[in-house]
Amino acid sequence: MVDTAVVDTALLEANQLSYHVQGQKLINNVSLQIASGEMVAIIGPNGAGKSTLLRLLTGYLAPSEGHCQLLGKNLNSWQPQALARTRAVMRQYSDLAFPFSVSEVIQMGRAPYGAAQNRQALQEVMAQTDCLALAQRDYRALSGGEQQRVQLARVLAQLWQPEPTSRWLFLDEPTSALDLYHQQHTLRLLRQLTLEEPLAVCCVLHDLNLAALYADRILLLAQGELVACGTPEEVLNAETLTRWYQADLGISRHPESALPQIYLRQ
């Protein structure tokens, strides 16, 4: 049994979550906790159920069994506006059919607040995500990586508050289209925010080395089950990764942090 216990100040708690469609169980008996100030990475092979789990943890899907609580309250009991001010979700794909400017897309994140302090919030998150130079461009004309940065700015705008407030941010592969600089910049930013604010970040990552460098804890999902949970040192070992990824790989050490780094054998 995987030990997923963290500190008593858990921001989110999932208890025995299962989800099935037409007799097929996509998520099976997953329990976990995520604490304020934590950065958690969800990893796993293709088809493991990572995106489905993310949707269960954010209330976009109702579990077939089990329940998920945010700040001690079941997700389905939250009022939509209050939930939108407390948690934000960056999905893997966010296409738009209409000619919105970048600033208009980011401003959509402020919908739960009306006009309250929008200008300050937008300027701050656009600067954080390197989007200021993109502000007046048509979102549809951006590269995939630029669109990802805009979507990150949007969800950060959604959670922006003038005073420290417990918040919850979920991201589905937020670095998949980014170049090396912006991968590093994005994960450094998220890490910094969890250290400075009462913010919990949980993101799906395919790059195990990025997960090792920036996550406090890693959740390994396989075949819909949580098969490993712990620090990068505890989860990212050759035996565990070879078993669940079925890849011929090895583990080395980062020359500066000594954290595990994964390489594929030729």
UniProtKB/Swiss-Prot annotation:
It is a peripheral membrane protein. Residues 12-248 form the ABC transporter domain. GO terms for molecular function: ATP binding; ATP hydrolysis activity. Keywords: ATP-binding, Cell inner membrane, Cell membrane, Membrane, Nucleotide-binding, Translocase, Transport. CDD domains: ABC_Iron-Siderophores_B12_Hemin. Its main location: membrane. GO terms for cellular component: plasma membrane. ATP binds at G44, P45, N46, G47, A48, G49, K50, S51. The keyword Translocase applies. It comes from the Bacteria. Signal peptide: none annotated. The keyword Nucleus does not apply. It is found in: Cell inner membrane. It holds the Pfam family ABC_tran. Its EC number is 7.6.2.-. SMART domains: AAA. Part of the ABC transporter complex HmuTUV involved in hemin import. Responsible for energy coupling to the transport system. Belongs to the ABC transporter superfamily. Heme (hemin) importer (TC 3.A.1.14.5) family. The complex is composed of two ATP-binding proteins (HmuV), two transmembrane proteins (HmuU) and a solute-binding protein (HmuT). This is Hemin import ATP-binding protein HmuV. It comes from Yersinia enterocolitica.
